[in-house]
Amino acid sequence: MSTAPTAPTVAELEEQERRLVFRRFTNDDAWALGSLLVELAREREAPVAIDIHRAGQQLFHAALPGSAPDNDAWIARKRRVVERYGSASYLVGSRFRAKGTTFEESSRLDPDAYAAHGGSFPVTVAGVGVVGAVTVSGLPQVEDHRLVVEALERFIGE
């Protein structure tokens, strides 16, 4: 029996985005959210890099043991998808797959610059819209996505 997490549906991913909205998002919020992600990743001994951007500025970055420079490249590629589409990188990739194609085949975007793989989630502020992205890289894409969502659920629920 497989213990791999089941991939969420497009509807489930869209519901996460509707739910996980901030009232505001400050530099201090980025630090607190990033620190929570580090704590969750350390509990799991996850070899990840974590990044939070807002309005083109990096507000938080951490590279945990076992992560590599490639994780930073993946972070940039996933974040660009969020910035371009205004949706989670995993949701964007899932929408392409639901249409019987892939992001790489059909987006017409450079795969060296964009990756619609799980792990980058929009920072959305109520009444404003998407202002940034929180991104994790180092695990399989479903797990990267789930780690970010878990942190957002805990943080926004506080």
UniProtKB/Swiss-Prot annotation:
Source taxon at top rank: Bacteria
InterPro entries cross-referenced by the UniProt entry: PduO/GlcC-like (IPR005624), PduO/GlcC-like_sf (IPR038084), YBR137W-like (IPR010371)
Family: Belongs to the UPF0303 family.
Protein name: UPF0303 protein SCO2848
